[in-house]
Amino acid sequence: KMAEMKFYKIQEYVEALRKRGMFASCELYGKEENVIRNLTYNSKEVSEDTLFICKGAAFKPVYLREAVGKGAVCYISEKVFELEAEVPYILVKDIREAMSVLANLFYNNPWEDLRLVGVGGTKGKSTSVYYMKAIVDDYLEAQNKKDSAVISSIDIYDGKSKVESHITTPEAVELQ
């Protein structure tokens, strides 16, 4: 399932949001059939055929203009932005909730192929996670399988490479 990426049309993102009760409205300017090949909320990561997510209290319209200049073909937001060109947009009730639906569709529901464990609490989460990882990895090694992955406030290990964590709760787009 993870081998080949399937891409979806703008209209399919609208339908996914509508199904989950997150859709508010949209103006697609006849571009509903355009295929989305990139999904991001970071204007520095925009490329051709990007669905750009306008999120956060610090979001500035200049980020959206930069994204459109780099190839964003549609944006999703809680409000409409004034732009020079007719850029399709999708309005949602809650951008953070909508991000999980967008990421799920864009990455073809990768969670369906995973077994997940979540740890919450006030103290000892990372310690508990690394104890669990050691136990699970011993089991996986005995089965001739790959190491387990981990996302913590210390680092993120996807089974291949490890990077230092910079935030305690990654966004849905990164988690997928």
What is the meaning of each model-derived region?
Residues K1-M2, Q176:
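Short intrinsically disordered, low-complexity coil segments enriched in acidic
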Residues M2-V101:
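N-terminal leader/targeting and accessory segments in enzymes
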Residues A98-Q176:
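Phosphate-binding loop of NTP-binding sites
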